[in-house]
Amino acid sequence: MPHAHIIGLGQSGIAAARLLRREGWQVTISDRNSTPTLVEQQQRLDQEGIDVLLAHNFELDRDSHPPDLVVVSPGVPWQGAGLVQARAAGIETIGEIELAWRHLQQFPWVGITGTNGKTTTTALVAAMFQTAGLKAIACGNIGYSVCDLVLSEQAIDWVIAEISSYQLESLPRLAPKIAVWTTFTPDHLERHGTLECYRETKAVLLQQAEYKVLNGDDPYLRQELSDRWPEVWWTSCNGRAALPHGIERGIYLEEGWVKVQEQPIVPVSSWKMPGHHNLQNLLLAVAVAHLGGIPVAAIAEAVNNFGGVPHRLEPICTWSGIQFINDSKATNYDAAETGLVAVPAPVILIAGGQAKQGDDRRWLEMIQTKAAAVLLIGAAANLFAQRLQEVGYDRYEIVETMANAVPRAAELAKKYSANIVLLSPACASFDQYKSFEQRGDDFRQLCLSRFAK
């Protein structure tokens, strides 16, 4: 019986383990952590015939019988010692999405990557295809693992996959019908090392795609990739003149309409999502739908009905004229700057968490322009306070926790006549939460319990 070792006891790792076990593999799944939740999962998986090792770092010399296959969860660094050993020993080492691709490659895929904008674009593309009557499943980094989709055995017409750079590291063979690159700014450099390595990791998805769609309003993509793939479809919110290679393969805004080549598809007035960045997401999704053969009527209906996704400029409630907005997905400076741009000033900003590498200058400039006050939480609070001081901004407070931040934000909104309280952290969440979703859920619950009575 062939033996597979799965690294990472998260949703994708568990789905991969169950899929391989169903196919007759001997399966071991390991995780470097050991928590009460993981122990409960260990007990459940043991009943399914899956061995679970907790507080375990995968290394070949620790295993008397090396596995035939290693499957890596997204959170596991591709250059970790155990994985380097496995690849050097000739052991096939892949990611969960690669495993799923081997079972679903008979279906057309849309693969969506980028620093920011992935989730909204993925959800909107899926909505357009579903409105046309197709069984199009949003999966991947959006929260539903692709191996779970395989296990579900449901009918499929299209796979709509959000794919992060972490997942692309271990995804050598994926060849989507349509690939989308939403934006590119410095992020995850603690994982990828250099901007160039991060870029090339992203580029893998498009290299093997039949159709390639890029955001022509992203300065980095426009500068670095305008001549790399001549067959690219480009989008632009700035009209046909801004398309890198004209309208032959162009989707753009003109006269209040989203147009494909010269055909009006949907009026911008039907799009409810705030912010210029969401217009970019809209154009990318329309491009995918056009290439996927979706009728114009279905595209327009999906756009009109689309209400957004949680944790991306998500309106929570309004109290005394103050709107509370959850942008917990803003886990880097660029996304947090975009969140500030999307809402009217003055704003009470809640920021902080686990800091990332990156250029914070434009984010700080936007704080100076839009924020009446800033409340700092989490491990990055002192660092952010120092950076705000350095640019001459002094209306900040270190409040440490979300529970302290929400009521204080309401007080400051009254003081400064601000109509918006915005959680847009510019940080990862792992210092205080297990995910940005849990952080956003905490913010939502605190707002609703206090202000939605």
UniProtKB/Swiss-Prot annotation:
Binding-site residues for ATP, renumbered to this chain: G114, T115, N116, G117, K118, T119, T120
GO cellular component, one term: cytoplasm
Protein's job: Cell wall formation. Catalyzes the addition of glutamate to the nucleotide precursor UDP-N-acetylmuramoyl-L-alanine (UMA).
Protein name: UDP-N-acetylmuramoylalanine--D-glutamate ligase
NCBIfam families listed in its UniProt record: murD
UniProt cross-references to SUPFAM superfamilies, sorted A to Z: MurCD N-terminal domain, MurD-like peptide ligases, catalytic domain, MurD-like peptide ligases, peptide-binding domain
Spans traversing the lipid bilayer: none
A molecular function GO annotation: UDP-N-acetylmuramoylalanine-D-glutamate ligase activity
Entries under InterPro entries matching the protein: Mur-like_cat_sf, Mur_ligase_C, Mur_ligase_C_dom_sf, Mur_ligase_cen, MurD
Gene: murD
One Pfam short name: Mur_ligase_M
Catalytic reaction equation(s): UDP-N-acetyl-alpha-D-muramoyl-L-alanine + D-glutamate + ATP = UDP-N-acetyl-alpha-D-muramoyl-L-alanyl-D-glutamate + ADP + phosphate + H(+)
Record-stated family: Belongs to the MurCDEF family.
Domain of life, per lineage: Bacteria
Pathway: Cell wall biogenesis; peptidoglycan biosynthesis
Enzyme Commission identifier(s): 6.3.2.9
Compartments reported by the entry: Cytoplasm
Record carries keyword Transcription regulation: no
PANTHER family, alphabetized: UDP-N-ACETYLMURAMOYLALANINE--D-GLUTAMATE LIGASE (PTHR43692:SF1)
Keywords for this protein: ATP-binding, Cell cycle, Cell division, Cell shape, Cell wall biogenesis/degradation, Cytoplasm, Ligase, Nucleotide-binding, Peptidoglycan synthesis
Keyword Ribosomal protein: no
